[in-house]
Amino acid sequence: MSVWTHVAGIIRVDGFRLNESDPEPNWDELIGKELNWDDDSEVREVREIRKNYHKCSEEFMPCGSEGSLKKVIWKNPDKNSLASYTVSVFGDLRDYDDLVKIEKWFTKVCSKLWVRDAVITADCELGSRFTAHWDETKEKLVGN
């Protein structure tokens, strides 16, 4: 029987976008790459990761046996607004129950960004769960 962990998080990111030449953030470097098990990629590294998903490197978002978490980036069209981006992270991780690892990953992500607000919840079907928000004054996740 498979164990599933369900994750939903959102990060509101502040930033200055003063002109068109300002570079876009590299979200894969800041948050992690997505890994999709249905990709037809025959790249040796990807094949190796698929076999050893529990050892998924830090360049990827947390991974279960059928893929990683996903991310969606919303860019605020109002360039005069300090609230520049909203990042959604979400997914269902099969054969994954390490909520501490998810919490550490989210903390690492938030510490790299200028976070206005951030919250995450993760629920493992084995009965463990956490919900936390980013406390910018303490620069850490604070649980409920």
Place the predicted regions along the sequence by residue.
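Short, extreme N-terminal segment that most often corresponds to the first beta-strand
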Residues: 1-36
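Charged interaction segments
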Residues: 24-26, 30-144
